[in-house]
Amino acid sequence: MTTTTATLHDILELTGDVWRVRLKPLTEYPFIAGQYTELVIDGFSYLFFTIASDPSQAYVELHIQAGSDKSNSLIEHLQRQPSVQLNPAAGRCTLDSLTATDAPLLLIASGTGFAQIKAIAEDQLAKNSQRPLYIYWTSHSLSQLYMLEKAEQWAKQFDHIHTAALISEQSHWEDKHQMLINSILSDHQEHIASCQAVTCGSPEMVYAVLDSLVEKGFNAEQMISDVFDFSPREN
């Protein structure tokens, strides 16, 4: 597999112990909004991150949740050795995987799943699309909505973008995700059958949202998520 060399453009600590890392590929690095990359660094393995920038930008942006020994070591490594190898972009969670339509697009994320939402939203803006975008970003604390100001600014600046920040301190995942589901249905229950969705979060969250929306008439084939590939349901 051919890798691409990239250098560190900048690294910034955001709120919620999340770091924004922007890498500058030294040669062309093609990707589609919604795909992910893998960093190739000696001493590390399984460094998969969703690309948070859109393809029109000159760098590859990553959102890294620190706190674990592995992620903390990675941040320290990038600060010391600002050059990495990138495997080719991969992943099928892209809008070209869905039927072409101007119907509302639900962009649903928890935690650093916002990276995927950001890439897709910015790609739509770069293409001057007027398609309605409804962003639902959930977390158990406000600090973990680390780019909420950006998402809210989109909603202020563009009439076709709507942002909902959902904070739940519930520890049980069914209770935690019910607020998210209720918020989506309160906005779209009457026309949920025509909506499409991109869902970025844990398998429990993704499947809970999918099942609840399908019960109300949503077409399951119109939701995309990386979860469907890395954690598929058993038949």
Model-derived features with residue positions:
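Reductase modules of NAD(P)H-dependent flavoproteins
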Residues: T2, S71, H140-N235
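Histidine-anchored nucleotide/phosphate-binding helix
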Residues: F114-A126
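Short, Lys/Arg- and Gly-enriched loop/turn segments at beta-strand edges
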Residues: S45-A52, G91-T99
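Ferredoxin-reductase
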Residues: T2-P82, S141, E169
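A structural signal for isolated positions on well-ordered beta-strands in alpha/beta enzyme cores
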Residues: E61, Q85, L106, P132-Y136, ...
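Phosphate- and divalent-cation-binding pockets in alpha/beta enzyme and binding domains
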Residues: S73, Q116-A119, A208-V209
